[in-house]
Amino acid sequence: MPRPPRGRTPLRTIVSALALVVVALAPLQLGGAALAEAPAAGKQAIGQKSRPATKQHPPATATDLGPRVVVFDSSMPVADIEARAESIWSQQVNAEMSSERWSLLFKPGTYGTDADPLQIKVGYYTEVAGLGASPSDVVINGKVEVYNRCLTDGPTQPYCVALNNFWRSMSNMTINVNGTGQDGCRGSANFWAASQASALRRVDIRNGNLSLMDYCTEGPQYASGGFLANSRAGTIINGSQQQWLTRNSEVASWSNGVWNQVFAGTIGAPSEANFPTETYTTLDTTEVSREKPFLFIDGSGAWRVHVPDARTASRGPDWTVGADTGRDLPLSAFHVARPDQPARVLASALARGKHLLLTPGVYDVDRSLVIRRSDTVVLGMGQATLTAVGGSTPIVVEGKASGVVIAGVTIDAGTGLSRSLMHLEARRGHGHHRGHGSSTPTTTLNDVYFRVGGPHIGRTQTALVIDADDVLIDHIWVWRADHGIEGFTAGASGDTDRWRTNTGRVGVVVNGDRVRATGLFVEHFQTYNTVWNGEDGHVVLYQNELPYDPPSQADWTQPDGTLGWPGYKVGDRVLRHQLYGGGVYVFNRNDPSITTESGFEVPDRPGVRLHHVMTVNLEAGSIEHVVNDTGARVDSSAPGQPSFVVDYPAP
């Protein structure tokens, strides 16, 4: 079922204005990339050892990554590539709860021409990625796009939105935007009209606009993303995107904000000086970042995985400033997993010191995949999904491991109650541990998604438990499903059944110190969505919706009588914590009379600081305050109108 309209009043104004002017926006091309600096001593620039002096690439060594990995070569006719991509898109465009997973990979080369551009669309559970060492190694003259879906069961008709456009990605390529053959509106931008779990990474958008909404369909055209990192673009049209994080990128211009547009380490980011009139939150640098690992083909035709180093106080894309250093791992260092392999095979490979490359598909995991060795990489392709079986915790990272990277993986709760879906354990003994120096996180999570319910019944006590220190979260979505195909009937949209069956008490618990997050999205859990007990937490963009489905106020009241649970809770004993750009939304669909006391709850201490936070009503339910007892009430008398707190505590 569709998610409800969000922010209807302000978004309609924005959409109407954009529809009139956006096609007139002049395509803007950024200048050439800055010359890359030499890598620091002891560091290896990506592909350095094997890249030839010329830009020519020999044929890639044959690599079998399974039937759901499609590899394109620039010698293939554009029509053939489009036909194959279209057949996958037509299968996946409405397949929100399906088990199909796809990875579309492009070998180094140039695809499409000015007269005959390559134009493809991206559906659910589909990854589109270049196989070059640099985004400039794969050039698409054309488009890679996501459009609105026009839903026949929406609350109004027509109902064309991107609110449910989840679980897809594009990375590591250059797009020379070319709309030849499309109508005037469609030709005006490369559209990426997606919501959560739809990352854009390591892309270079040239010669045209990048639009994060689809303004070419009928209305209401809502979107609720989103994440862009390590990328470069000219004009970016935010449009109806309610919230968005842009990290370590370069932009020429940004059209507008809605509720919570956040920028960290981004060249050309808009100023936050007029907040909340302009809803921008801008940090000049990113405190700690580590880019997502990716597959590439080196100069000899060998397939490798590049694992980037961490950066501190960084700004701009690593590939434009000579900072794309790291390790290049051969595929022989990985266990290349298939969905039909039992969990014991994957666990055994980890125990033998192998990294894991999860090819596209859904994996049944009846025992924990335990990571004990430092520097282990678990990389998923095509939204690879691990489903908990028998109440398992699919991934556990032992406390002694450091430098671990888990990326591109979705973890589903199963029908048996899990204690957690991922557990990052604390180091045993006394003291703190980094193992690689102060800049390398103990574990990094890039594009890791958690799901409770949706395609099937799911149950977990907590989705993600972080007991380790020095963890880096870089774009995760932790989602207890507000809709699905489980067959629920009781309550609004089956919500009473959903509340009683798809149990997820807590979304994220952070007990470790110095845990950092760039892009933390947590939604619909039955008590706390996020509880942060560790010291020196640092969060850049937090997005939360409270659960839609409590049957009554009694179900949404704490034992001490407090009305509801805040969407973001900092532990009472915490001395130091920072949050930049946060939003908590309420849509109590099952009982619109439900009230929540506050969106954010934090201890009143000088070291605990929230910067640019808000609450908003989405037509049902109310929140009395934004932070503790500060900030105006939001309710259905003014749906879509946020209540902002610029700084808490006030300066």
Regions found by a protein language model. Name each.
Residues 1-38:
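Secretory targeting and sorting signals
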Residues 21, 33-651:
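Extracellular/periplasmic carbohydrate-active domains that bind, remodel
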